[in-house]
Amino acid sequence: MWTIMIGSKNRAKVHALQEVVIRDKIIVRSEAVPSDVASQPFSDQETIQGAINRANHCLSFDGVDYGVGLEGGVVRSEYGLFLCNWGALVSQTGDQWVAGGARVPLPQEVAHELEGGKELGDIMESLTKNPDVRMTDGAIGYLTDGEISRKAMFQHVVHLLIGQARRDGHLLRTVTH
């Protein structure tokens, strides 16, 4: 049995991991750990680094076999600002896997506020009038009119991470699905 720690107490992120590994003999723990990047990552590189940093911080806790970091950010393109999300899975043996997920263009008014220094989560709270939006639908829920939740978006990334690890002989299933 393995223990995986996710470097966040955010319910959307924690539940994303729990629901992906629920049928496996894996213990999921969560702790708030720093990303060591800006509170609003503004590139793929910074968002990836935040996810890797969170995952690595998890390995410093006793009894943790694998660490997971999930990080949301924004990225500039010739088509405007896009929402991005990245994840990292690291093992105590030094292995590391990285995966990214959905990209959705941000409305011009949201991009303008981001460029002015606001955090996406704060902007979404204001737009949705939901102080809990980071734990529920997130920006992706707003941008897709509820078709995709933040949890579902991060579940996709977790599936990509776990799948890569299993391909490499880690976290092999111990129960039949």
From Swiss-Prot:
Pfam families: NTPase_I-T (PF01931). It comes from the Bacteria. Its EC number is 3.6.1.73. It catalyses: XTP + H2O = XDP + phosphate + H(+); ITP + H2O = IDP + phosphate + H(+). Signal peptide: none annotated. GO terms for biological process: nucleotide metabolic process. Keywords: Hydrolase, Magnesium, Manganese, Metal-binding, Nucleotide metabolism, Nucleotide-binding. Its cofactor is Mg(2+); Mn(2+). One of its GO terms (molecular function) is ITPase activity. The keyword Lyase does not apply. Binds 1 divalent metal cation per subunit; can use either Mg(2+) or Mn(2+). Phosphatase that hydrolyzes non-canonical purine nucleotides such as XTP and ITP to their respective diphosphate derivatives. Probably excludes non-canonical purines from DNA/RNA precursor pool, thus preventing their incorporation into DNA/RNA and avoiding chromosomal lesions. Belongs to the YjjX NTPase family. This is Probable inosine/xanthosine triphosphatase. It comes from Halalkalibacterium halodurans (strain ATCC BAA-125 / DSM 18197 / FERM 7344 / JCM 9153 / C-125).
